């Protein structure tokens, strides 16, 4: 009860111990809410009654009462966008499984984050059921981490940002830096003599990690560029400075690393942004874009995967040019339409491809987007992360495969290149689909637009 009151900034009475916990007015909390499955008792949405019922359902002194998930929120999103992101993640990953989620968002400018407290028992119209042991498995936790990255990246793309989150370890990302430690204490208090010993030790460990990371980047500035462009393919000087400050020990080391990166031959200056701000990338990203273009041009020039005109069919002629292009020859196609038109056109194309012996599969960056693609078009769909895992395990697309990627405008350069490489290896057809209004909202040129220009799509 005390933890629930503290996180939500609420006043709650603990019936078991007869104690009232009052954290009303606690600073930094910008939103708190309880989300639960439909058709549940009204008391579930009352924080005090909910957590008193949770405590009453457990009899052992060492019982686990709840699970806490903490997620960092992208600083690029505004408060309304962050709330929408957290709600979608909770609804898809937790509430849909029968959990109750009591969450709050803390809105510090440098570290916005959300605390999500989950019940361990499913809830129905009759109340709490038995504890769900399968919610505790490592595979489930890994799925939650991957799902958070997918959902956050989807929302970042919707808001027009190119920055991306990667849930994998730095080692898996092939980034030669050590992960930092979460300190759990405000920066202003870190020199406080009254800090408990475990926090002092944690701070010392973080200082050591920052020093070693700084030494690594000083010895090889390309490490910094690889790590930064993995998050931000195009970055400003301010973003470079922010990145290096958080990964170096002190001002002297920071300035030395910054100078080394600026003098690095792998740093590439780009044309200034619309606001006049200088922008940069790395030679590795430039070569990745060239590779993407070469592959797209090669795939577009291939014959095959066409449906004869007399076997195409279509219920309306509103998208005839786009429809004919999709069903024509070539192993890569792009499509930009409003959501409603896109769904109707893809559903018609799906029927035509399937009727001509092709296997049509769908994918999207997030679980929600994949589900929407499947329900609106009938194309069986999975997340892109699930497909990538399949490809890493040896699974391949085949010559009769058509892979439809929705929300393509939000994909990063390396991820889009991996998808096209998988289609290219199997001689499959890749169909990249973007929503017109979302493509227009992108604050930087997207890899999707690069592909579209490379294959000269006009209709």
Q: Which ranges hold each PLM region?
A:
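ASCE P-loop NTPase helicase motor core
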Residues: 240, 334-459
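N-terminal nicking endonuclease/strand-transfer module with a His-rich metal-binding environment
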Residues: 1-249, 255-263, 275-279
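Pre-Walker A (Motif I) flank of P-loop NTPase domains
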Residues: 67, 328-335
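Short beta-alpha connecting loops at secondary-structure transitions
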Residues: 132-136, 272-280, 403, 430, ...
């Amino acid at each position: 009860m005390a933890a629930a009151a503290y996180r939500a900034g609420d006043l709650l009475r603990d019936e078991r111990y007869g104690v009232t916990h009052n954290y009303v007015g606690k600073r930094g909390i910008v939103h708190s809410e309880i989300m639960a499955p439909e058709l549940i008792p009204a008391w579930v949405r009352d924080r005090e009654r909910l957590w008193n019922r949770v405590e009453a359902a457990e009899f052992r002194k060492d019982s686990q009462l709840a699970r806490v998930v903490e997620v960092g929120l992208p600083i690029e999103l505004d408060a309304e966008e962050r709330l929408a992101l957290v709600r979608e993640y909770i609804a898809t990953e937790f509430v849909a499984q029968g959990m109750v989620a009591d969450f709050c968002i803390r809105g510090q400018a440098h570290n916005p984050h959300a605390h999500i407290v989950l019940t361990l028992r499913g809830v129905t119209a009759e109340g709490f059921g038995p504890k769900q042991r399968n919610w505790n498995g490592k595979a489930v936790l890994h799925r939650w981490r991957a799902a958070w990255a997918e959902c956050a990246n989807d929302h970042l793309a919707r808001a027009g940002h190119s920055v991306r989150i990667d849930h994998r370890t730095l080692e898996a990302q092939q980034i030669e830096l050590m992960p930092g430690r979460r300190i759990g204490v405000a920066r202003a208090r870190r020199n406080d003599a009254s800090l408990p010993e475990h926090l002092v030790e944690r701070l010392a460990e973080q200082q050591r990690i920052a020093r070693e990371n700084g030494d690594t980047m000083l010895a090889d500035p390309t490490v910094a560029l690889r790590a930064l462009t993995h998050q931000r393919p195009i970055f400003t000087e301010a973003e470079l400075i922010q990145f290096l400050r958080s990964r170096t020990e002190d001002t002297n080391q920071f300035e030395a690393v910054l100078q080394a990166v600026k003098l690095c031959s792998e740093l590439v200056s780009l044309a200034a942004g619309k606001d006049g701000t200088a922008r940069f990338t790395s030679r590795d990203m430039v070569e990745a874009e060239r590779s993407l273009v070469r592959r797209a041009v090669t795939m577009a020039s291939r014959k095959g995967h066409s449906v004869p005109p007399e076997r195409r069919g279509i219920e309306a002629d509103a998208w005839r040019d786009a429809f004919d292009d999709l069903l024509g020859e070539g192993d890569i196609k792009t499509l930009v339409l409003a959501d409603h038109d896109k769904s109707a056109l893809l559903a018609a194309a799906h029927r035509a491809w399937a009727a001509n012996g092709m296997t049509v599969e769908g994918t999207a960056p997030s679980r929600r987007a994949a589900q929407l693609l499947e329900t609106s078009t009938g194309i069986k769909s999975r997340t892109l992360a699930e497909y990538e895992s399949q490809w890493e395990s040896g699974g391949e697309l085949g010559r009769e495969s058509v892979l439809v990627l929705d929300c393509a405008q939000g994909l990063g350069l390396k991820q889009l290149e991996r998808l096209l490489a998988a289609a290219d290896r199997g001689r499959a057809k890749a169909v990249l689909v973007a929503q017109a209004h979302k493509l227009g909202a992108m604050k930087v040129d997207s890899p999707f637009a690069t592909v579209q220009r490379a294959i000269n799509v006009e209709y």
